[in-house]
Amino acid sequence: MLDEMKTTDLFTSYYAQWIRVYKDGAIRDVTLAKYRMTQTWVEKLIPGRKLCEMTRITYQQLINDYARSHERQTTMDFHHQLKGAILDAVDEGLIERDPTRKVIIKGKTPSRKKIKYLNQFELHSLLSDLHLGKEADWDYFILLIAKTGMRFSEALALTPKDFDFSHQTLSISKTWNYKDGGGFMPTKNRSSVRKIRIDWQTVMQFAELTKNLPPGEPIFVRRDSGGGYEAVYNSTVNGILDRHCKRLGIPAISVHGLRHTHASLLLFAGVSIGSVARRLGHASMTTTQKTYLHIIQELENQDVDLVMRSLANLM
């Protein structure tokens, strides 16, 4: 038990107990899994380190060892997931002084990840290739994400009552726990709870599609024979999307790539970064700016060209 720990006990044992006491049942499963992963790394990097041996030097070495194979932001997350447990150990007298004080966070240089998205012509080709029948299927799912920029788990959680067809709006207030047995879950963050406008064509399509469906049931997740819900896999939808792209001879993208496509088309159309951030449910405009930096830079270059042409025409 945590209250029976001694300074000579292993830090790995303490950290496992700390997670069990303070995090089990208190945080989302996906966040708990990250703490479990941190625990695995601690067991790998300092398996025999005792609580009384946790000094600033030994902690800095732990961070350095982790940073060798991880980017700086990931190392920062690793540090934050350890720090709470360590400060509690200091408060309990299990560690003499705070070893995390003045820690230096290092990490590998992040690889430049260029996001994949379709241009307007390619997206038009993709949507024209969808077979939209009378029942909700993955082609309708692909259409909806392309038109709204929703996250995969948000779209899975949609129910008919989330649509307000008379006002052409869609309420996003929950996600679907597709990774762990199904069921509704909270959104990624508070900013993810939002109401977005949808175009009249999407209104017509989904008003017809959902008119006979149970109001509170997910549109795209079916019930199984036992009364529960069938498992849904990201790879299933990605596979269908991939086949559409290959048949059309356009770049193959994932479902998340559809979200990027939606955002990029809005930015190229001149929609403000703030509006795009709110529509995507980003916690801040900084997230949007970082994710779509290359598009923003391209738009800035276009602005410079426009300014130069305007100035040249003054004479």
Residue ranges: model-predicted function:
Residues 52, 95-97, 109-128, 179-200, ...:
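DNA breakage-rejoining catalytic core of tyrosine-based enzymes
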Residues 175, 199-250:
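Active-site/catalytic core of tyrosine-dependent DNA strand-transfer enzymes
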Residues 1-5, 29, 189:
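Short, surface-exposed polybasic/aromatic micro-patch for ligand or macromolecular engagement
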Residues 76-78, 91, 95-158, 166:
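Basic, Lys/Arg- and aromatic-enriched nucleic-acid-binding interface segment
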Residues 91, 143, 147-154, 243-245, ...:
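C-terminal catalytic core of tyrosine-transesterase DNA break-rejoin enzymes
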Residues 167, 180, 185-193, 197-204, ...:
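C-terminal secondary-structure termini that scaffold catalytic or DNA-interacting sites
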Residues 90-99, 165-171, 208-216:
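Proline-centered turn/helix-capping motifs that create local helix->coil transitions or kinks
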Residues 11, 19-94, 133-134, 228-236, ...:
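N-terminal core-binding DNA-recognition domain of tyrosine site-specific recombinases/integrases
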